């Protein structure tokens, strides 16, 4: 934050965005406990910059086609010893904020996973997430220098150079979708980005294998991760998690971009 010496920064909270003026203020309000807020703005044309400035954030502007590259730029922009990585649709609760402060003062490890409570609209949907369609936890708290994102457009792979610590007990609130239409749009966006990665690497795979994954992922999310407990939303989560690989595969085979 302005006026604070760089050496005093223990914790940086960082988010990377593209035109998130509708959600950014609420996100930043929930990370105001950090010593530094960093906002990486990817080709933003809305009012996001003014919002970030209001919170005294360190702002990095640029253009990134690869999600992993953008996230790595965000990490590099942080001055803190520890980094808390959040998305614009995520809110850090007061209990989680207090736990994070305690962990960074006492942890002998290099990174920790954070549990996630996902919301569709105003409804909390806790069960069924995973298999590249949603997250139940993520490695969001880490020392600078131990986490590197891979060069993928969607769901970049991670490379670690440090020791994993215990999972945090409190959860971040993730307002992932407003409703079913958002869920469908997200599946379309994810599969398009994944198809581009597959074409570039030549790793398109076989139709038969991706059909098999449709069923295995559905069973994993609906039965193994108890999506059945969430009613219709749980059914859709499992269905979309299963469809994601086969739709990505077909797009990679049939479409140029």
List PLM regions with ranges.
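Acidic helix N-cap motif at the loop->helix transition within catalytic regions
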Residues: 22-25, 46-55, 95-96
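Cell-envelope/extracellular polymer assembly enzymes that use nucleotide-activated donors
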Residues: 10-12, 36
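Short, structured coil segments at secondary-structure junctions
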Residues: 33, 54-56, 161
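A conserved acidic beta->alpha catalytic loop
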Residues: 30, 41-51, 64, 87
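Short, well-formed alpha-helical segments that are part of the catalytic scaffolds
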Residues: 14-33
């Amino acid at each position: 934050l302005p006026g604070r010496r760089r050496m005093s920064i223990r914790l940086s909270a960082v988010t990377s965005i593209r035109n998130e003026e509708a959600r950014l203020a609420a996100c930043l309000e929930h990370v105001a406990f950090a010593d530094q807020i960093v906002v990486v703005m990817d080709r933003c044309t809305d009012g996001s910059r003014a919002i970030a400035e209001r919170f005294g954030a360190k702002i990095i502007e640029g253009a990134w086609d690869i999600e992993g590259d953008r996230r790595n730029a965000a990490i590099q922009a942080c001055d803190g010893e520890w980094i808390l990585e959040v998305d614009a649709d995520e809110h850090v609760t007061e209990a989680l904020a207090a736990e994070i402060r305690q962990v960074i003062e006492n942890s002998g490890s290099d990174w920790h996973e954070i549990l996630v409570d996902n919301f569709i609209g105003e409804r909390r949907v806790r069960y069924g997430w995973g298999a590249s369609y949603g997250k139940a936890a993520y490695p969001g708290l880490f020392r600078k220098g131990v986490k590197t994102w891979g060069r993928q457009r969607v769901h970049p792979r991670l490379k670690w150079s440090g020791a994993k610590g215990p999972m945090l007990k409190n959860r971040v609130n993730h307002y992932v979708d407003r409703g079913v239409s958002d869920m469908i749009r997200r599946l379309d966006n994810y599969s398009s980005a994944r198809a581009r990665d597959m074409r570039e690497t030549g790793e398109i795979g076989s139709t038969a294998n991706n059909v098999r994954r449709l069923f295995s992922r559905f069973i994993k999310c609906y039965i193994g991760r108890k999506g059945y407990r969430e009613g219709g939303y749980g059914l859709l989560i499992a269905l979309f998690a299963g469809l994601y690989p086969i739709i990505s595969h077909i797009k990679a085979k049939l479409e140029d971009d």
